[in-house]
Amino acid sequence: MANDENKQKALAAALGQIEKQFGKGSIMRLGENRSMDVETISTGSLSLDIALGAGGLPMGRIVEIYGPESSGKTTLTLQVIASAQREGKTCAFIDAEHALDPVYAKKLGVDIDNLLCSQPDTGEQALEICDALSRSGAVDVIVVDSVAALTPKAEIEGEIGDSHMGLAARMMSQAMRKLAGNLKNSNTLLIFINQIRMKIGVMFGNPETTTGGNALKFYASVRLDIRRTGSVKNGDEVVGSETRVKVVKNKIAAPFKQAEFQILYGEGINTFGELVDLGVKHKMVEKAGAWYSYNGDKIGQGKANATIYLKEHPEVSAELDKKLRELLLNNTGGFSSAVSDYVADYEDNGEEVKNEEF
């Protein structure tokens, strides 16, 4: 018993010395602090928020979003920025690809007048800007588009054709070590968009890999694989794309879930269409024949008209969104039993889907 008391005294003294040297909060018991509650920002897609398990992307963490060209990577990050700005948060966009379209961003709901934007010359400059913004504590969301475009200074100053083996990977590895702690301290969300490359000579398994080495894969709390699976048509006109997002890695909830939603050209994620689908799935929206009803009132004939009704009545869509989140997400940020009915398991049959109605 005396030995236990001596141990507790020694532990208390050690904790006191650590806090005195490194500051209060430098060491703590896991259950005593806000570390139990992860603050999140909505992705703009209700089904993806559900698949992530905590209601969105976690603050203070690194997130990687990767996929083929024209799969919706930049659109998804702009929707995250729009969601954050609606909550009064400050956002920054590091446009290493020099391809950000402010007109399109504005259509997605981004307040471009208050969006910080940088088009860096080198990869080192881009990552230094990220580090400076995160250390300031004044920026809540930083998006880097993309890792593949973060070109090391030595490569830019060299000749085309020169070999620069592993330069980008070393640059990213050093940056991750430096950024991870600063992001946690300032509670800043850092999203990296990444591209896909093919590994040569792979006979078995997936030949796809992402650029920038392995460091980002380890440091990322969430990794999302986004793919276009088909077309959304209005008659013969293609008005959008069916999109599937797989949660390949998740440190805040159960991984290997996936979400499917529509991205409409010029509008972004079809949030109201998701509300109709999820509402019907969980019996909050009644469907009788082609008619959709909510709280006993008819809201439209056909999914397209029901979607338009929710778009024109924001108070109704906000109420339905709140009810669905309360049902599908529990307080601990994990999965409720209802979620498994909607969020599909991690699989990919590779079939293209044609959806005539949106």
Curated annotation (Swiss-Prot):
Q: Where in the cell is it found?
A: Cytoplasm
Single GO biological process annotation from the record: DNA recombination
Q: What does this protein do?
A: Can catalyze the hydrolysis of ATP in the presence of single-stranded DNA, the ATP-dependent uptake of single-stranded DNA by duplex DNA, and the ATP-dependent hybridization of homologous single-stranded DNAs. It interacts with LexA causing its activation and leading to its autocatalytic cleavage.
Per the UniProt record, one Pfam family is RecA_C
Alphabetical list of SMART domains matching this protein: AAA
Taxonomically, which superkingdom?
A: Bacteria
> Which InterPro entries does its entry note?
AAA+_ATPase, DNA_recomb/repair_RecA, DNA_recomb/repair_RecA_CS, P-loop_NTPase, RecA-like_C, RecA-like_N, RecA_ATP-bd, RecA_C_sf
Q: Which UniProt keywords apply?
A: ATP-binding, Cytoplasm, DNA damage, DNA recombination, DNA repair, DNA-binding, Nucleotide-binding, SOS response
Name recorded for this polypeptide: Protein RecA
Family according to the record = Belongs to the RecA family.
GO cellular component annotations of the record: cytosol
| Protein residues bound to ATP | G67, P68, E69, S70, S71, G72, K73, T74
State the Gene Ontology terms under molecular function.
Answer: ATP binding; ATP hydrolysis activity; ATP-dependent DNA damage sensor activity; damaged DNA binding; single-stranded DNA binding
Asked if the Swiss-Prot or TrEMBL record annotates the protein with the keyword Mitochondrion, the reply is no
